[in-house]
From Swiss-Prot:
GO MF term list: acetyltransferase activator activity
Annotated spans, Disordered: 626-646
Organism: Schizosaccharomyces pombe (strain 972 / ATCC 24843)
Self-association state and partner proteins as the record states: Component of the N-terminal acetyltransferase A (NatA) complex, which is composed of at least ard1 and nat1. nat1 associates with the nascent polypeptide chain and the ribosome.
Subcellular localization, as worded in the UniProt entry: Cytoplasm
Biological process according to GO: protein maturation
Cellular component terms (Gene Ontology): cytoplasm; NatA complex
Broad class of where this protein is predominantly found: cytoplasm
Residue spans of biased composition, Basic and acidic residues class: 626-645
Coiled-coil regions, chain positions: 599-635
Name listed for the protein in its UniProt record: N-terminal acetyltransferase A complex subunit nat1
TPR repeat ranges, renumbered to this chain: 10-43, 45-77, 78-111, 146-182, 185-218, 380-413, 415-447, 493-526, 677-710
Amino acid sequence: MAKVQLSPKEITLFRTALKCYETKQYKKGLKAIEPLLERHPEHGESLAIKGILLHSLGNTKEGYDNVRLGLRNDVGSGVCWHIFGLISRADKDYVQAAKCYINAHKLEKNNSSLLRDLALLQSQLRQYKALADTRNALLQDNPGVRANWSALAVAQFLRGEYASAYKIVDAFESTINQGVPVDTQEESEAMLFMNLVILKKDGVEDAYKHLLSIEKKVLDRVAFLETRAEYELYLSKMEEAKSTIYLLLDRNPDNHQYYYNLQRAYGYEDASGKVLDSAEWLNLYSQLAKRYPKSECPTRLPLEKLEGDEFLTHVDLYLRKKLKRGIPSVFVDVKSLYKDTKKCKVVEDLVSKYASSLSTTNKFSEDDDNSQIEIPTTLLWTYYFLAQHFDHVGELEKAEKYVDLAIDHTPTLVELFMTKARISKHKGELQTAMEIMDHARKLDLQDRFINGKCAKYMLRNDENELAAKTVSLFTRNEAVGGAVGDLADMQCLWYMLEDGKSFARQKKFALALKRFSTVFKIFDTWADDQFDFHFFAFRKGSLRTYLDLMSWEDSVYDDPSFREAAQGSIEIYFALFDLPFAKYSPKLPDFEKLSSGEINEEEEKKIYKKLKKDLSKRLERAEKLKEADKSRAKSEDGMPVKYDEDPLGENLVATSEPLKEAQKCLEKLLPYGDKNPSAYILAAQLYTRLKNFDTASKYLEQAKVILGQNDPTVISTEKFYNSIKTQSN
């Protein structure tokens, strides 16, 4: 097709529309482009501009149609390809966007902004080889900008080409040595990055020498000292390591790792953590306690390794000090010692004696002199400790006894009722636990933590509406979606997860999927948030932080909250596939009747009629909620009003392909299957339902390797697999 030639007036209209897009005046931009398209309805670039304006106004399908039509009419236009890339990028389709930018750059080789955007996409997609080529092209275009050198060096580092990364950083550093002005913060970060490159390229010894040579240039003293201490320990330069670690402790005497490293530097502990000289080791901590009197570490850390009478002596002093001061978190502090059952018993006997003596003599021990009389609250915190202790070890009757004694002593302390509620929860008394936690909440209505804890107990008791009403005391209830919508905006993972699990227990699958999908969106947002940093990090010179970010983002979905939401969703999709009536979200009694298969046809018809009626009511309610959200949503100039199209999740549960949806959830779990073998179990169950028995068998075998042949989930999945396979044959 011959390319349309625009008149000067038409070119002005085109530029006006483009300017309107850049300034977010989308409706005005459409008015500018329409007259041009009336005269030239097949002008590709104008169609593409119209498409991106419509897309920006929320008309996604029409926007894509116009862009694709424009591209078809003018496939040789870099503008059309660029616009297609922009809308693909806006919709998080980074693979398609990268292809579009590559095509656009082929047609506009002098457009460096295309290369910059392409580099961001390649970083997001972890296409490191292609990224290195793109960063190199940007460097050739503008070698005077430090960010271009840094970006190329990092790209080479990420693809494992450490020698190339070193050459690039070294080449730029040589220009600085010739008198080129430099930002000291950027230079400091570049030096530490270069040291990391040398470590990967040449090993610890060369990295240590380089680190010492750049000491005066490094502004991040903590990073410098930590790295130096690490190298000195590795190279067995123990005297130097001691000096370095003491400098770190002087800065932060509450960092546990510094103490562990100091033990190694003195030779009192090996790399595995085993104490080699207990007397000298204990003396070291005694000296450290005098040197850092405000830090708890020198008195707390020895408790991890001490045994027998020495442990008894030191834990006695430690607990007395904490209970005297009335520190509520003392049990949380010491419960890690309970991994050793002997230490657990020592602590139990010791604190039980405290309680007995304090209740009669106001002293920790009857052998203490009269100058050691304790204030009344010491007994309170001792009872509180014992309540938590016995709850932790599963002796719930004793736990309840001590928490009641504490409440009798001080009936207005919130923490006591929280512990009493937890004990009731562990006894399986969810209603009682919820009521006690609500009483605790009412003792301090200004405390957001106890409000959230109470809501959590309500959700565990399947009181969803009451929980939402409770958290609404601390949310913006005028937000779209009300209190729950505001919690979603605040990325409140725990609430969405607990709410979803509660709805799943009640077989309200639509709402359960809705909450789990909110969890997915939060994690997707975190994954997408890195996009801007692919540019920003190099502008600021934060190279090491950027590498940490990339490492964290690589495992962003390896998170317990995401795992629970994904597994919950997959199990619901399995139910939707296995039980067609599940899409109606029947109440538990009806769900059990229908799934039992023991009801007659007439009763089944009655239940289905009721389910359809309930569904109709829910759909009406969903429409009302959408209208309410529309009235609450504020429209920005030229921007579409944002509200939830599916507030109750009915669209999610109505899917015609539940196994396909389950597969989408599973794809993000499987990369971490070795750490989370339940992903392999779910995969085996999914592919069994799909009758892809070879794949199902593969995942079942992987689960067996990790969990063992006798694991209950392995056994049940294997039975399910064999049953379906037999039926298929």
